[in-house]
Amino acid sequence: MSDADALLWVQRVEKRFGGLSALSDVTLQVRAGEIFGLIGPNGAGKTTLFNVVTGIYAPDAGAVSFGGVTVSGLKPHAIAHQGIARTFQNIRLFANMTALENVMVGRHVRTRAGVVGAVLRGAHTRAEEAAIERRAREFLQYCGVAARANDLARTLSYGDQRRLEIARALATEPRLLALDEPAAGMNATERAALTQLLERIRDDGATLFLIEHDVKLVMGLCDRIAVLDYGRKIAEGRPADVQRDPAVIEAYLGGSLA
């Protein structure tokens, strides 16, 4: 793949915490329009890499570019404005706000008024707020949680909270959706529904970059996969090829990939 094909380009990234090397010389490219999976044993550096990509951490070496623009070192809100949205392994909803309000908060990233303007609520802002609500309801419908629009986020089932978090991320109209273990805690029925939703998001034009411990889900969903182990990339390619890679099998001790 040429550099011109990459929407997200992680270039020789390193991240250290004291004497611990969490990421070492990691390079990968995510193409526009694909679902790209990042897997590896616990402690491999997957979430650290997500944190570097989304601006929570600055890399100690290397760089991250998105759409041809260097974004490493930018704050998370600036990276969100570039078109990267993220969900977290531990769901981070506003528990005492409704599902609709949660998505509206996400939508404010893409408005002229922003969150502060929504509080001040001038005439123009009120009209914009009505448009934001309509759009937020569309994202709730898209993600299958429209019926819970007026319910507090904390009252939703775990699966619906995951869907709500995705709806809020989509409300920013990202070019890249970064999902940190989106299937965590889901039962088989919820995982199947999630897979359908993620495929639909990809088919509608977004690019997905996900961490997931459910290797079976990753192998069936992703177009390409990278594998981290002890902070280093040990494999990258199509799921079928990665699954047969001796280094990957050794890292997982044959268990999850058997």
Regions found by a protein language model. Give the residues of each.
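Glycine-rich phosphate-binding loops of nucleotide-dependent enzymes
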Residues: 2-258
